[in-house]
Amino acid sequence: RVIPAADLFEETLSFAAEVAERSPLILKILKRTVNDGMNMTLQAALSHEKAMASLVFDALDAHEGCEAFLEKRQANFTGK
């Protein structure tokens, strides 16, 4: 999305705050998956993404995120 220059700093801080509320483990896996995929063929990247997704789904933080969403509360991520 395009943000006016005058609003860029505030929007950046707001986005950073949203990211900081997420699971550090899941963010690490996501970043690694995207970076790794940039150097792969599409088929290899999709296979890699599928393998990494299993790590995400098995993570305790993923379960905590789902439970928090269903219970309409803030998630308490542990990085595990």
Listing of model-derived features with the role each one plays in the protein:
Residues 1-47, 54-55, 60, 76-80:
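C-terminal long alpha-helix characteristic of the crotonase
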Residues 66:
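Flexible, glycine/charged-enriched surface loops at secondary-structure junctions
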Residues 72:
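Conserved N-box asparagine in the HATPase_c
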